[in-house]
Each structure stands twice: as structure tokens, then as C-alpha cells.
Swiss-Prot record:
UniProt gene name: asd
Protein species of origin: Shewanella violacea (strain JCM 10179 / CIP 106290 / LMG 19151 / DSS12)
UniProt keyword Amino-acid biosynthesis, yes or no: yes
Catalysis performed (reactions): L-aspartate 4-semialdehyde + phosphate + NADP(+) = 4-phospho-L-aspartate + NADPH + H(+)
Pathway: Amino-acid biosynthesis; L-lysine biosynthesis via DAP pathway; (S)-tetrahydrodipicolinate from L-aspartate: step 2/4; Amino-acid biosynthesis; L-methionine biosynthesis via de novo pathway; L-homoserine from L-aspartate: step 2/3; Amino-acid biosynthesis; L-threonine biosynthesis; L-threonine from L-aspartate: step 2/5
SUPFAM superfamilies registered for this protein in UniProt: Glyceraldehyde-3-phosphate dehydrogenase-like, C-terminal domain, NAD(P)-binding Rossmann-fold domains
Keyword Oxidoreductase: yes
Protein name: Aspartate-semialdehyde dehydrogenase
Keywords: Amino-acid biosynthesis, Diaminopimelate biosynthesis, Lysine biosynthesis, Methionine biosynthesis, NADP, Oxidoreductase, Threonine biosynthesis
Binding site for substrate: Q159, R238
Length: 338
């Protein structure tokens, strides 16, 4: 990777954009020049990169022919407007929104799961980053899927407020502070109080009674695995945790598997840190927050189903669930296609 690339981070003032810039530096991505971009409201500020302060530029004034790789994390409307323009000017867009995920000609990629799909970036010069909850689930399930097959996935998520952005983090902190002082909590980001509470709604409700967040996990799992026969039954829940998503997953495998068989394939899988004993298990706060792996624990045989396996999966939704996965896509892109 001696070649260097001019890199755009669109949404550089947001939590995911800032983390992308940190990870580009941490992983020594070959950046010739970094262009942090944002709306006019956020332009003029700076970000730190490789020991220097780099000015955040106004996306409206940017010449896209200057960049070869663009990381987009500024919302679906922004990606809808700017990704085609960037792509037409030769910038490969790695988009962290849901704008292009379900387009048949746009690859949806988790490098540990389906890196070969990146080859299809040539269709439109756009690669989609999956939803955070899908990413950590499929990193954990890919080795099981390959070894035993999976016919059905039941999953309940416990998703931190950082998945809703900086305003949600501020709202949780503010509500906690007020409630502990005996004052009423005000809710703006969420429909109900999030502090000391759990909300069984993430995103809007669909006609079938599932939320859009839940249906993302269905659609994305089938697309990434290339398997329309796999059945996914999700319930997505927002919990009063700042960083890190957790998932309780029940699988039905095609071939029967014991817990030790599943642990054996997880032990060798990329991107996974396995907790093997019953007494040790990962949590979003104590293990995943601020780290890169997908953590798996509580692996056990389902006592109610002969082909059932249960496991507990946690990961940092801002890192592996968004920024890190995007940078890993770019690493495969420049390694295999440049």
C-alpha cells in the first residue's frame, strides 16, 4: 500500500465522522491529504489529524475531482445529494447511511463476512456500510453460518443512545442529572424518557408492525449472506447506555451443533473476541465501548430446540458498527483493486 489517497470525510463534525478520522490515523491509512467536509453551519472548525489541525470545509464549495475515497456519514439526504456527484468525479464513496444499502447494484459490505462483494463498487463507485446492529450480528454469525448453516435468527437488540447521535447522548445525560435531583426530565430526541428506561422502538414503524431498524436487519442479513431463505425475527430496543450495542441472539442451525462446536469456529474467526466461561461475559460498557472487536459470550445450546444455539454479542456501535467497518472496507478496496 505505497500509494497514497486524497480522502474526504463528509460529516467530519459528527461523532462517526470524528471517529473515522481517528481510525484513519490509528490504522495508518495511506492518506495523502485529508478533506474534512460538513455543512456551512459546521464549516470553519477544525479536526485533529496526524498531529495537525485541519480545517473543516463547506461541502457546497468542494471540488470532488480532488478526492479518490470518500467516507460519508452526514445523513441520508446528504448522501443522496453528494454521493452521485462524488462518484461521477472518480471518488469512491463508502456510505454509512441507509441511502444506498438496498440498491441491487451497490455492494453492502462487512469485510469479515463478504469482502468479495467490494468488487461491485465499479457499478456506481459507491459501497454501502451496513447498519450497526447488522454488522456486529453478522460478524458473529458468519463462521456459524459457514460451518453449520443457519435457517432462522431471532434477535433482541439493546442499543445505546449514541446510535441516535450527539443530541441523544446529551439528552440521556441531562435526563439522568435532572431525575437524580428530583426534577422532571424533558424528552426531545426520543418519544419517551430514555433515562432509567428502555424503549422498544428504534426508527419509525412499518406497515407490518416492525420498525424500520428491525427490518434493516432482515433485509441486510439476506443481502450480505446472499441468502433469501434465511429468516430473521428482530426486536430492536433503545437502552440508557451511552456507547455500545448488545444483542441476545437465538439461532436455528441447519446442521445440528453443540455449544462447543460453535465456540470452536468462533475461536478462529476474524474480528471476534470470545468469552468462553459462563462466569465471564462481555458488556457494552466494560468491554466494547472504545474498542474494535465484536465480543461474543453466553454461548449455549438452546434447551427448547434441537438445532438451537444462543449467544450474546456486544460491540462499539460507533467504531465497528460504523467508522471502523468503513475504514476496513477502504483497506480492502485499496489492497485488492488499486
Amino acid at each position: 500500500m505505497s500509494q497514497e489517497f486524497n480522502v474526504v470525510v463528509l460529516g467530519a463534525s459528527g461523532a462517526v465522522g470524528q471517529t473515522m478520522i481517528e481510525i484513519l490515523e490509528e490504522r495508518n491509512f495511506p492518506v495523502a491529504k485529508l478533506f474534512p467536509l460538513a455543512s456551512s453551519r459546521s464549516a470553519g472548525g477544525t479536526v485533529s489529524f496526524n498531529g495537525k489541525q485541519v480545517e473543516i470545509l463547506d461541502v457546497d464549495d468542494f471540488d470532488w475531482s480532488q478526492a479518490q475515497i470518500g467516507f460519508f456519514s452526514a445523513g441520508g439526504d446528504v448522501s443522496e445529494k453528494w454521493a452521485p456527484i462524488a462518484a461521477e468525479n472518480g471518488c469512491v464513496v463508502i456510505d454509512n447511511t441507509s441511502q444506498f444499502r438496498y440498491d441491487n447494484d451497490v455492494p453492502l459490505v462487512i469485510p469479515e463476512v463478504n469482502p468479495e462483494a467490494i468488487a461491485d463498487f465499479r457499478n456506481r463507485n459507491i459501497i454501502a456500510n451496513p447498519n450497526c446492529s447488522t454488522i456486529q450480528m453478522l460478524v458473529a454469525l458468519k463462521p456459524i453460518y459457514d460451518a453449520f448453516g443457519i435457517s432462522r435468527i431471532n434477535v433482541a437488540t439493546y442499543q445505546s443512545v449514541s446510535g441516535s447521535g450527539k443530541e441523544a447522548i446529551t439528552e440521556l445525560a441531562g435526563q439522568c442529572s435532572k431525575l437524580l435531583q428530583g426534577l422532571p426530565a424533558e424528552s426531545k430526541v426520543y418519544p419517551k424518557q430514555i433515562a432509567f428506561n428502555v424503549l422498544p422502538q428504534i426508527d419509525k414503524f412499518m406497515e407490518n408492525g416492525y420498525t424500520k431498524e428491525e427490518m434493516k436487519m432482515v433485509w441486510e442479513t439476506q443481502k450480505i449472506f446472499g441468502d433469501d431463505n434465511i429468516v430473521v425475527n428482530p426486536t430492536a430496543v433503545r437502552v440508557p447506555v451511552f456507547y455500545g450495542h448488545s444483542e441476545a441472539i437465538h439461532l436455528e442451525t441447519i446442521q445440528p451443533a453443540e455449544a462447543e462446536d460453535v465456540k470452536a469456529v468462533l475461536r478462529e474467526a476474524p474480528g471476534i473476541e470470545l468469552f468462553e466461561s459462563n462466569e465471564e461475559y462481555p458488556t457494552a460498557v466494560t468491554e466494547s465501548a472504545g474498542t474494535d472487536p465484536v465480543y461474543v459470550g453466553r454461548v449455549r445450546k438452546d434447551i427448547s430446540h434441537s438445532h438451537g444455539i444462543n449467544l450474546w454479542v456486544v460491540s462499539d456501535n460507533i467504531r465497528k458498527g460504523a467508522a471502523l467497518n468503513s475504514v476496513q472496507i477502504a483497506e480492502v478496496l485499496i489492497r485488492d483493486y488499486y
